UniProtKB/Swiss-Prot annotation:
Protein name listed in UniProt: Forkhead box protein P4
Xref: SUPFAM superfamilies: Winged helix' DNA-binding domain (SSF46785)
DNA-binding region: 436-526
Signal peptide positions on this chain: none
Function, as annotated: Transcriptional repressor.
UniProt KW Transcription keyword: yes
Taxonomic lineage of the native organism: Eukaryota, Metazoa, Chordata, Craniata, Vertebrata
Composition-biased stretches (Polar residues): 8-27, 239-259, 576-599
GO biological process: negative regulation of DNA-templated transcription; negative regulation of transcription by RNA polymerase II; regulation of transcription by RNA polymerase II
């Protein structure tokens, strides 16, 4: 308002004492004008008339002071206009001063300048107003096009709203033109302090009519804004559950029936997730719809935005959440299964049948004849059985193997589950999973030959059996074939026979059973101390007392050596020898008479290239190595762990 105090002229105001008076008076007028603009809607007609008279008197005094200032201050600028009119006079409204008063106060040139200023200001305001209206309409159209979720009813409502806004703009334009004409006739002026949106009225309109007109205009604007807000909230509330149900897919149709405008009906039909194969896929609704138009009509009528559709949407959200939880659980279960299958368990399977080391020679001989393949032998005496052999042998292996990591499966595991039963139980696993089988090449070759009806295979047939039974050999480099040929030529249990088919390989079971790992011999006291020191705490008292005695008549016979070796070694066929070849003296694997008071105790081998840790023994302890035919020196790089 302080800007209105300055007069519109090109030359600066003189700096004498008289020139400061109009500024003060103008500032007072501006403050009073602003006050009047603020309180105009609250004054009664009598107070308003009195206020207008005071404004006219102040205007007259201001005009006189302005003229006096112009006369007293000499002009030095050639561009000084001949007519000077203060802005406050140009901004005076008809309620403040009547045309008669203006004619009495102002000269004709000043009146013309006031009219020109009013017209220029009004044109500027009209341009700004129309520009803002166009921007608002453009934003509304863009928002509707981007949303693309208007139904025909809502589109018709939007068209009506646009038509109403256009009519309102036309009425405002006509009103502005009428006001300009009236201003040219020197009847009305522009209201001071008016905003960019002019709402003018005729001077003859009473204050009550003006108030009613303003109320109607504000109510219409509120209704339009409320409608826009309702549309926006509807789009938000309907799009939220759809996005919650299926986040990665943008639904072309929302739960309240709103659909996007597509370029082609076929593309819209193919991408609509609630319509397929001629029926509605809304949960719980299987209504038949012949075409897309009928489906859209059904969707808008039966599945509109109501309580039932909202409840169904919430139920669908809960269903999806439950499925996500179930999927997470199943994924964790699958991960645990994969981890278990790819990592061998730390503890082997428990042994089911207890064994006896003390038995008669005849029973041992019969058992050895009955179980030629080294299978577990049942107990043959009524003596108390020992604890499962797995525990004691595991202790021996752990004492002789300080290293950790992927190691050869222990003989006790093979003793509990022979290779035939192992392959039968885990046939599908080895066939599909790329896991290295825990058996030596010799045992696998023997198993391949025994599975054939005629007990003979060619070299290519052995290769095919390896690749057919194990995914590991099928998917890795075929360097393992060298190890197969090496084992076939090394071990005397594999016999090469020439027949009609060519060269075939067979297996000699008796020769195969003679294959034994390095054995340790010692006195019975050593055996007792070693077994008790290595964890045989669960041995019963009768067995410990039997070991403490000096004479073992039942342990001296050769069949018992085989039986005890079968028990301690598990009768298994594939243990790699780690003894040094230089120590072999070509003696028979049976013990000489001077070692008749000793028994055989198996030393668990470590990796193929690592010698086992020796166990301390008395001076009479002697290690006897079998002959060369018992050695199973496979290729170090190709030996199975």
């Amino acid at each position: 308002m302080m800007v209105e105090s300055e007069s519109i002229r090109s030359t600066p105001t003189s700096q004498n004492g008289v020139g400061s008076l109009p500024n003060q008076s103008d500032s007072c007028v501006g403050r009073e004008g602003s006050g009047s603009g603020e309180t105009n809607g609250e004054l009664n007609p009598a107070e308003l008339l009195h206020f207008q008279q005071q404004q006219a008197l102040q205007m007259a005094r201001q005009l006189l002071l302005q003229q006096a200032t112009c006369l007293n201050s000499p002009s030095t600028d050639n561009k000084q206009p001949s007519v000077q009119v203060p802005v406050s006079v140009a901004m005076m409204s008809p309620q403040m001063i009547t045309p008669q008063q203006m004619q009495q106060i102002l000269s004709p040139a000043q009146l013309q300048a006031v009219l020109q200023q009013q017209q220029a200001l009004m044109l500027q305001q009209l341009q700004e107003y129309y520009k803002k209206q166009q921007e608002q309409l453009h934003l509304q159209l863009l928002s509707q096009q981007q949303a693309g979720k208007q139904q025909p009813k809502e589109l018709a409502l939007g068209n009506k709203q646009l038509a109403f806004q256009q009519q309102l703009l036309q009425m405002q334009q006509l009103q502005q033109q009428h006001l300009i004409n009236l201003q040219r006739q020197n009847l009305v002026g522009l209201q001071s302090g008016q905003g960019p949106v002019p709402m003018q009225s005729l001077p003859q309109v009473s204050p009550s009519d003006l108030h009613q007109l303003l109320k109607e205009m504000s109510s219409s604007q509120e209704e339009s804004s409320k409608q826009d807000t309702v549309d926006l909230m509807t789009s938000i509330t309907t799009s939220f559950p759809t996005t919650k149900v299926s986040p990665p897919t943008m639904h072309p149709s929302l739960s309240n029936g709103q659909n996007t405008r597509r370029e082609s009906t076929s593309h819209y039909e193919s991408s609509h997730l609630l319509y397929g194969h001629g029926e509605c896929r809304w949960p719980g609704c299987e209504a038949l719809c012949e075409d897309m138009g009928q489906f859209i009509k059904h969707l808008n009528t039966e599945h509109a935005l109501d309580d039932r559709s909202t409840a169904q949407c919430r139920v669908q959200m809960q269903v999806v959440q439950q499925l996500e939880i179930q999927l997470a659980k199943e994924s964790e279960r699958l991960q645990a299964m994969m981890t278990h299958l790819h990592m061998r368990p730390s503890e082997p399977k428990p042994f089911s049948q207890p064994l006896n080391l003390v038995s008669s020679a005849s029973n041992n001989k019969m058992s050895h004849d009955t179980f030629p393949d080294g299978l577990p032998q049942p107990p043959t005496s009524a003596t108390a059985p020992i604890t499962p052999l797995r525990q004691g042998t595991s202790v021996i292996s752990s004492s002789s193997l300080p290293s950790v990591g992927p190691v050869r499966r222990r003989i006790v595991d093979k003793f509990c589950t022979p290779i035939s039963s192992e392959l039968a139980q885990n046939h599908e696993f080895y066939k599909n999973a790329e896991v290295r089988p825990p058996f030596t090449y010799a045992s696998l070759i023997r198993q391949a030959i025994l599975e054939t009806p005629d007990r003979q295979l060619t070299l290519n047939e052995i290769y095919n059996w390896f690749t057919r039974m194990f995914a590991y050999f099928r998917r890795n480099t075929a360097t393992w074939k060298n190890a197969v040929r090496h084992n076939l030529s090394l071990h005397k249990c594999f016999v090469r026979v020439e027949n009609v088919k060519g060269a075939v390989w067979t297996v000699d079971e008796l020769e195969y059973q003679k294959r034994r790992p390095p054995k340790m011999t010692g006195s019975p006291t050593l055996v007792k101390n070693m077994i008790s020191g290595l964890g045989y705490s669960a041995l019963n008292a009768s067995y410990q007392a039997a070991l403490a005695e000096s004479s073992f008549p039942l342990l001296n016979s050769p069949p018992l050596h085989n039986s005890s070796g079968s028990v301690l070694h598990g009768g298994h066929d594939d243990v790699t020898s780690t003894g040094e070849p230089g120590n072999s003296n070509g003696s028979s694997p049976r013990l000489s008479p001077q070692y008749s008071q000793s028994i055989h105790v198996k030393e668990e081998p470590a990796e193929d290239d690592v010698r086992p840790a020796s166990i301390s023994a008395p001076t009479n302890q002697t290690t006897v190595l079998p002959e060369d035919r018992d050695l199973e020196s496979e290729s170090p790089m190709e030996d199975l762990p």
